[in-house]
């Protein structure tokens, strides 16, 4: 990490740390040392599956040890990066309010207790001299409580649907999310070849919505759900979409940008390679 951070810094790239600190803690909460901090009892003994790994393993926020542990791992990771930003993640805390924190969630509301824990983490990052970021999926379900979060917290609003609308983003912006990023995706998860048409639609729409609501920027994403079976090189086309659309409001038609990528990135004089790959990825 230190070497990569130095390399990026030399190229003017801000390498921003991103660390699960609330949900998606499969490896941590399956250990003998920390299994007792899992929201759902017995999760550590469940047979392995990619679904279980992704859908469960959220911290029990009613146990004071959970906050101490989260701060500890944030502190250790933070020291490896020179960036002034830190993404604490806190996405997909599916189990929150369903196990150890059920009574607390029934008393206050699941989203409210979520904001309380995220606030603790965000304030810790701020006190450490960094600007905190987090994913939007939980708070976007009940944006009316967004005011409970710290003002300097940057909201990373993700939505990967090809027909994504601006509704959730607008609700967040109108509910007090002053610092927003739009976060589309390159559509490579759970398949061998990325879905390029869907990536074009998703990224171009999110870029347009971000411009309309004066977002801070665009964060293009590539995920490895269920083992990341696709080769990373297949994501290059989606990455180029993100690079092109995030700075230029005059978005090129899909056929034209695919032609340009085919010629400039892959040396295909016919300009058809990306279109052929898109046809290939949609074959049964």
Feature roles, as predicted:
Residues 19, 41, 90-92, 184:
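Short, small-residue-rich loop/turn micro-motifs
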Residues 1-14, 25-68, 92-116:
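Aromatic- and acidic-residue-enriched carbohydrate-binding clefts of CAZyme catalytic domains
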Residues 20-21, 223:
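Short, ordered loop/turn segments at secondary-structure junctions
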Residues 22, 31, 264-266:
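Secreted glycan hydrolases and related glycan-binding modules that recognize and/or cleave
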Residues 3-6, 12, 64-79, 83-85, ...:
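Substrate-binding groove of N-acetylhexosamine-processing glycoside hydrolases
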